[in-house]
Amino acid sequence: RVMAEPHIVLRTSRLAKCVGERFASRCIDAVMAGVSFTQIDVLDEARRMGMPWDEAVGFDHSSALSLDMLSRDAMLEGATFMINDEVRERINIADMAFSVDRVVSRLSECMTLRIGDLIYLGAPEQFEVKIGDNYKVAIGDKVLLNFDIK
């Protein structure tokens, strides 16, 4: 069983380590649309055995990322995830548990962010993947990802 999660993806524009929240937005220069895939059965087994989740989330084609990028301000418009042209989720930055600035700041405390790194913002919901489905992810009114599940 495979589940999909839509994401707003941030691209870092500079080297960053221990960046304060008030400066964190300066580290982002673009946003993209993304979808990550998780093998739930593999994840459940890894959890049960106390093992790493790598195989459940890091397999071939485990993530889709738009080629088009928008300015960082576009993330304020939020994202829409559609399956077969039906809106299944709306992601609003203001509704996230942690602000983008907090996420970037915290990540920069744990690791050095480098130019071009991608940050997949958390997704509130997962959707079961079905062969033949069409996925679209839009930021604002621009569809950035449009692909079929094969």
Range-by-range predicted roles:
Residues 1-114, 118, 125-150:
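Catalytic-core "active-site belt" of small-molecule-metabolizing enzymes
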